[in-house]
């Protein structure tokens, strides 16, 4: 991914770069984003800094907040240290439940603590408001559901 970020910076385009971070350290990011085992957080941040240096465009970091996984006070402090001094927006998205996945949405108290730590450290952060989660149409919930069906032959389709 860092080589692609460097290529994007060289294009002199008007693209806004959004990086899916989801964890403030390699140990946790290796679990959540398997490609991190090949490209660590440090290398990713170096590429992001290069993009900013070349383009002058503010970076966006995406962080899906998962209850009991990446929403601790320690995670917030580590994230603050990682982003401190960068011209960037941190877009935090509290997890929206998806059937079949083990993750949970953090409590309102956990979200508030996480936000307070980041804001106290001077991090520019936006917490996405949950919309559509009651009808499974929120961020992360829109995905194809498979159904058992018998494929139609061309003749059967023509007869229908």
Model features per residue range: what roles?
Residues 112, 125-127, 140:
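Short alpha-helical segments used as structural interaction elements across diverse proteins
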Residues 92, 126-129:
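A structural preference for short, hydrophobic beta-strand core positions in alpha/beta folds
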